[in-house]
């Protein structure tokens, strides 16, 4: 929304964002291609898929996996339902209600940026707890409020609170089993499928 107001659209409207994303992606690929990365040599045999899944038997890893699922589920779910909430409760049109998605990403981006500084001063555990508390308060607010400003505040709090959950959970899971970094990384990334599970459940509900 903001980008299409500030740059020429060439009669493409919001679709102008796709060429911009493509250019950014190509630049990132080229820069990554010329970046020297020293990878550690793997010792021993690679773990099998079954051995990776067996790590879910450890409570901390299982909770981290569920945390990643919830993080992505909240992310996708908020994007899809926030405009719908505004349309149902305030009678807004789709074009106006779509600003809720932009608002979510504005606060999510701000949270990612500020999180890098906050985590220098605060422990990951405390920051994670505050982030979750912000989201819980905001979600409760979405059930209660019918005022546009308060709904916007709740959406912003969810975006800010959810901005650093993935990085905190992912890093803590790796620190828990430093000898199984590849396996743990694979499991955490597998948790991204929560983005398909939670919106489906929300749609059924």
Language-model region placement:
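Helix-to-loop junctions at the C-terminal end of transmembrane segments
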Residues: 111-124
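Extracytoplasmic gate region of multi-pass secondary transporters
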Residues: 54-112
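Intracellular juxtamembrane helix-capping segments at the cytosolic ends
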Residues: 163-178
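Juxtamembrane intracellular "pre-TM" segments in multi-pass secondary transporters
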Residues: 37-64
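A late C-terminal transmembrane helix in Major Facilitator Superfamily
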Residues: 176-205
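Helix-loop-helix hairpin linking two adjacent transmembrane segments in secondary transporters
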Residues: 1-36
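Paired small-residue
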Residues: 149-157
